[in-house]
């Protein structure tokens, strides 16, 4: 975790709920198979300090299949099949910006440019979607969203689906841009995700705010 995040979240990690959460997580890793790998739980916080975040893409759960989750929302490791929601994100990326088809599902290239890829739950038991929800992670990640929402520099928050949209109240919408649509999941993508142009909208707004746009194309 970047030192700036460590400092900001130090008090949060000392709260009773987080101590209980962390006890639960440690036990879960010991007794069951949990994703992502333990050293990747806070990977989203490694690459980018809060003051350098330009865009937040909010996910829900880590992937719950082998070798998929790497601590960044929607991202998978190199060499792993690109999951359906991410495939749809890429389809929209190609349509929106004319990017070539990405060959990897690894989104480190976005993270390294200040795209904060945050799940609202940071761990999950293998094969059991949502299994670590309501254990305390949401309180922790709500605090993270609040911290980002209080940053001086303007940030784009991308909220896909009802779960992500429910976090809008944590964000100062006078200072930041919130882009909302249905989730890129195959179940909903055709109902308003395709054609929503989140990538170009993000860059247009960042440039209006005198911030550097993001190179979204993934080679």
UniProtKB/Swiss-Prot annotation:
Designated name of the protein: Uracil-DNA glycosylase
Similarity remark: Belongs to the uracil-DNA glycosylase (UDG) superfamily. UNG family.
GO BP field: base-excision repair, AP site formation via deaminated base removal
GO cellular component terms given for this protein: cytoplasm
UniProt xrefs under Gene3D superfamilies: Uracil-DNA glycosylase-like domain (3.40.470.10)
Gene: ung
Organism: Exiguobacterium sibiricum (strain DSM 17290 / CCUG 55495 / CIP 109462 / JCM 13490 / 255-15)
Source superkingdom: Bacteria
One MF term in the entry's GO annotations: uracil DNA N-glycosylase activity
Pfam family, one: UDG
Lineage of the organism: Bacteria, Bacillati, Bacillota, Bacilli, Bacillales
């Amino acid at each position: 975790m970047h030192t700036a995040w460590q400092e900001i979240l130090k008090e949060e990690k000392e709260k009773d709920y987080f101590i209980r959460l962390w006890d639960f997580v440690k036990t879960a890793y010991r007794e069951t198979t949990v994703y992502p790998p333990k050293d990747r739980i806070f990977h989203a916080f490694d690459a980018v300090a809060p003051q350098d975040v330009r865009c937040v893409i909010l996910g829900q759960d880590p992937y719950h299949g082998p070798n998929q989750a790497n601590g960044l929302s929607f991202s998978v490791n190199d060499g792993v099949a690109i999951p359906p929601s991410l495939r749809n994100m890429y389809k929209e990326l190609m349509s929106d910006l004319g990017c070539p088809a990405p060959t990897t599902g690894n989104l480190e290239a976005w993270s390294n440019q200040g795209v904060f890829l945050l799940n609202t739950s940071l761990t999950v038991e293998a094969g059991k979607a949502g299994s670590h929800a309501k254990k305390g992670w949401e309180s922790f990640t709500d605090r993270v969203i609040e911290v980002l929402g209080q940053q001086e520099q303007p940030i784009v928050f991308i909220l896909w689906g009802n779960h992500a949209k429910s976090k809008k109240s944590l964000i100062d919408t006078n200072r930041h841009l919130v882009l909302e649509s249905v989730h890129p999941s195959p179940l909903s993508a055709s109902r308003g995700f395709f054609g929503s142009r989140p990538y170009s909208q993000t860059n247009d707004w960042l440039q209006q705010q005198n911030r550097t746009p993001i190179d979204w194309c993934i080679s």
